[in-house]
């Protein structure tokens, strides 16, 4: 049987990360920023609690320890709070992100693609222009499940984030949502966002947190990459000891 050495190592490291769950503390840059810093220090914990950030933090750390990179997505959800809108923070699957090869910082990539599987009927009801385009044209990596999950009634939605300079040369972040070759939304076609871009800060809404850094990549490698050979060696030694115990325990007849 396999030992739980690798699993226990990762579980203990995750427990250490949860014991050190961070809390926001905003310090003033100047004396006249004191009131603003105090206000932000009071507001940010509430925002994170409403976004269920502790669960997101836990999920990101599991992926960071196992896969080598934890990715947090920070978005604006206009449908939250009864249509008032609010910040949404989510743990993002690294396998569903695609960027320009060779960049060290994800913000240096001119384009960034985020893929997701969504129900085709629900998408068609929300975006009528998708009617008649139910055939999937993009495939995505999938985890292997014991219950044999089917994706026959789902379509791949591509969230395309890209940076382009405006007439003044300043990089603006834009966003295009596509599904089965149909444009569902484009910020450059939105009069409110065509000139200013999707977000005023002009950055991709994804934060990469690698465990062990790789050169020329925003992603890293994790403990499974480092410790799997040791786990295999432990299992082989355990198997050899079990065989010896079984052989030694057999009753001998003279």
Language model region names:
Residues 1-254:
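Extended alpha-helical, oligomerization-prone segments that build pores/tubes and scaffolds
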